Amino acid sequence: MDISDHHMTDVGIIRPDVHIEVHVKSQSTAKRSDVRTHVLSLLDRHSTVLRSFKWMDFDNEFLTKNVESVTIADVTGPKLVDLKVHNLCIHIFTLNDDSPSTLNLEEEEELSAANLWLLPAVEFHGVWESLIYEEGIKTQLLDYVSTTIFFSDKNVDSNLIAWNRVVLLHGPPGTGKTSLCKGLAQKLSIRLSDRYAHSQFVEINSHSLFSKWFSESGKLVTKMFQKIQELIDDKDALVFVLIDEVESLTAARSAAQAGTEPSDAIRVVNSVLTQLDQIKRHPNVVILTTSNVTEKIDLAFVDRADIKQYIGPPSAKAIFNIYLSSLEELMKRQIIYPRQQLVSLEELETMNFMESDVTRLSLCLMNISQRSVGLSGRALRKIPFLAHALYGKTSTMTLKGFLTAMEHAVNKQRQEQASLVNCV
């Protein structure tokens, strides 16, 4: 059976989807239909592949000239994927390398209310893949937003089945909530590129709404959302709106009610909630919000969110995978040399964590990961850099030497963390 015949095998049997992301070079002038044909031919020759496999070198002149990479994306489950039993969803995209523009509210004051990116953006490329959480978190978020758009397309009556197109990610600082929002928007702009001609990402600077223009903040909120509404009015555009640290908006209302903040704060928050209610009615908008302090969020806001996902500090397993991806990158760049194979946690488990020449370095990494529990995702990503900067005796290091340096860096990070806690 030709792999390009990829819808149904028998009547009534629906195959599971597998997503193929095709990153086309920015200078390419090739038609999408031609790119698709050549990619299907490539997949037909490699019908069984590793999940998350990425082709970057091709034996096909057309693909070499026009395509940066072809990736089997976001597959969970078995390591090997049989493409012949899947429905192939091919997503062809080019990255936008424009810098973000700003949404200014007051020309004379140059008050920047938000930053605006065209997606998929070079700046967000690889963010989704770099974020490692407990299994299921990223998939659930992706499925949720995809379903909201699917229900909207099918004109499902929202009075009978309610959904708000609002996502709230909450948890301690440094766990990657803002990056996850950016990665999610980037991923969906690629997934839905056949449905929407283009996607935009608006990041609202909530702190600017509580600036020296405080007395006018209610009006400024309205003005900002009017500008966002103009983006949403283009029905060929998918618009993501990010409100970071939403507690700074919603906490203001309870503080004002308690008499500790001016009543203008209530007007600002009420204005934000009213404007969100207006824009979320549109099928082509998704509202993403983050909070570092869950208990300070206004209940009226929490009730508006369909998904309230806690993003906590990484577990030892997630930390192992974070470090593993960092070490792979350093071996690729020959900062760690020679390249040595590290065994995954799953493979260590099947070997009952027995020490041998094959597992020794991986077990060392596992111990470092366990020692790192409690550090934020932001801190964890800095450990390899600190290891080299502070404890690297030479510019190029062996894997064993680098793991020793990482151990020192983790110990230093934990000592600094303890010192800060004691100072408070």
Swiss-Prot record:
User: Where does the chain bind ATP?
Assistant: 171-178
Please indicate if the UniProt record lists NAD as a keyword: no
- What's an example of a GO molecular-function annotation for this chain? ATP binding
* Gene Ontology CC annotations of this record: chromosome; nucleus
Name the GO terms of the biological process aspect: anatomical structure morphogenesis; double-strand break repair; meiotic recombination checkpoint signaling; oogenesis; reciprocal meiotic recombination; spermatogenesis; synaptonemal complex assembly
Q: Name one Pfam family in it.
A: TRIP13_N
The coiled-coil segments of this chain are none
Which CDD domains would you find in this protein's record?
RecA-like_Pch2-like (cd19508)
Q: Which UniProt keywords apply?
A: ATP-binding, Differentiation, Meiosis, Nucleotide-binding, Oogenesis, Spermatogenesis
Stated role: Plays a key role in chromosome recombination and chromosome structure development during meiosis. Required at early steps in meiotic recombination that leads to non-crossovers pathways. Also needed for efficient completion of homologous synapsis by influencing crossover distribution along the chromosomes affecting both crossovers and non-crossovers pathways.
Q: Which family does it belong to?
A: Belongs to the AAA ATPase family. PCH2 subfamily.
Quote the protein name from its UniProt record: Pachytene checkpoint protein 2 homolog
